[in-house]
Amino acid sequence: MAYKSDIEIAREAKKRPIQEIGEKIGIGSDDLLPYGHDKAKVSQSFINSVQDKPNGRLVLVTAINPTPAGEGKTTTTVGLGDGLNHIGKNAMICIREASLGPNFGMKGGAAGGGYAQVVPMEDMNLHFTGDFHAITSAHSLLSAMIDNHIYWGNEAEIDVRRVQWRRVVDMNDRALRQITASLGGVANGFPREAGFDITVASEVMAILCLAKDLKDLEKRLGDMIVAYRRDRSPVFCRDIKAQGAMTVLLKDAMQPNLVQTLENNPAFVHGGPFANIAHGCNSVIATTTALKLADYVVTEAGFGADLGAEKFMNIKCRKAGIAPSVVVCVATVRAMKMNGGVAKADLGAENVDAVKKGCPNLGRHIENLKSFGVPVIVAINHFVTDTDAEVEAIKSYVSEHGAEAVLSRHWELGSEGSADLARKVVEVAEKDSANFAPIYPDDMPLAEKVQTIAKRIYRADEALMDKKVRDQLKLWEEQGYGHLPVCMAKTQYSFSTDPNLRGAPTGHSVPVREVRLSAGAGFVVVVCGEIMTMPGLPRVPSAENIHLNEDGQIEGLF
């Protein structure tokens, strides 16, 4: 049987005017700033007006460690949101925006897949409502003001060798990773080494996604450390007096974007921080607003549960004062087989033994998620090659680990295919059995926070930190940053720092290479291994196959 591509399905969508989607959740047309007919921003005045309403229930969708076989986390998030509406619940979806760089790099973009998508897909994967351009502009303004400050006398006494603030562009461009700036003579400033990151790696992006309102946004921007003096004391963004103008540039970008699913259900698509050097979740303002408008809000966190879900619980929930009622962990038969040692080319053949062998990775994630005091449901994202025996093997394993697995066919059937999963989510959520708590307190020393995650989530024997790292953490504690959560930056492919070590390894250690203070965002980044903040394009980038056809439609985006 031939299946339609995601783009073919998206183009056949019977979209409703965005004002109708807003009315479904109580947003009047006067409180929407339309961008065309099918997307709009929600006004700050409306957001302020609903703050006294009670919260709905929050559902987090996460997954096992990602494999090349693909797990379908966003697809499941969208499918579950549609499924909840299908069974009569008032539900919303909250996901991240797409970055241009990856869309033109490894593969085209998407917002879900099959019959579980958010539309307009093409717009969302290109310029959308301009949020990323605004973030890039605000970041670039600060870059320009730092060098301008140095040029006109350097009142803040910035050590030009210790400028921390790199430039950004929303593109994969390895040639810009390390550059020399201000060449060409005295009129162009003081030459120094610099570099570019991709926009989603910017601390401005992380701040926009954690700020509660514009006032909080401006304060956080001012708190960013941009450089150091010769005495190693920090220079803040507020010392350069850039935070006010940056806030002006970000004023509209702070407003959540309202779009719809293929089944005309409401979705907020807002923000998109990296899931390694930042927290990998959509914006706090979108999530908290959705909780005031819907009975159920379905959101996701980047990569596997050891990265995205851990940061969602320990960083986003802590900062925003929210808590999930239930967590859905997405797994696939294909991924279990790959964890069980089957090559990608052989995943289509039935192999129940390999499924069983690969299940401990899923079991580890279930145990970790439960340690936050939240009930866990496993969603088996169905692929057409799955057999009944393979699905039963996963269900049996999950049952032995004190959870329940539900087969979901949303990719193929839309909300009808996810109705069983939706019913199970409602059944569990309405028991109100969640007793959520982060796995470490604010006042725990920073080094102990790192050790706690390494031992309890990664099941390592220890995190290896040399004297330089420990001294830096102690210094930040003395400077008043000891209460901050830690944001672990490591490979997403394994519980360990070795991307090839699959399954549920124990007895390993987590080497900490460096630590970085994101004072504005409000967390300490703990770098374990190499961190790529500016990706490169592959040998054959997807951009080579993206073009307009004779009808002016985009081809090759997905």
Swiss-Prot record:
GO terms for molecular function: ATP binding; formate-tetrahydrofolate ligase activity. Pathway: One-carbon metabolism; tetrahydrofolate interconversion. Keywords: ATP-binding, Ligase, Nucleotide-binding, One-carbon metabolism. CDD domains: FTHFS. Gene3D superfamilies: Domain 2, N(10)-formyltetrahydrofolate synthetase, Formyltetrahydrofolate synthetase, domain 3, P-loop containing nucleotide triphosphate hydrolases. Its EC number is 6.3.4.3. Transmembrane segments: none annotated. ATP binds at residues 67-74. The keyword Aminoacyl-tRNA synthetase does not apply. It catalyses: (6S)-5,6,7,8-tetrahydrofolate + formate + ATP = (6R)-10-formyltetrahydrofolate + ADP + phosphate. Coiled coil: none annotated. GO terms for biological process: tetrahydrofolate interconversion. Belongs to the formate--tetrahydrofolate ligase family. This is Formate--tetrahydrofolate ligase. It comes from Roseobacter denitrificans (strain ATCC 33942 / OCh 114) (Erythrobacter sp. (strain OCh 114)). The lineage of its organism: Bacteria, Pseudomonadati, Pseudomonadota, Alphaproteobacteria, Rhodobacterales. The gene is fhs.
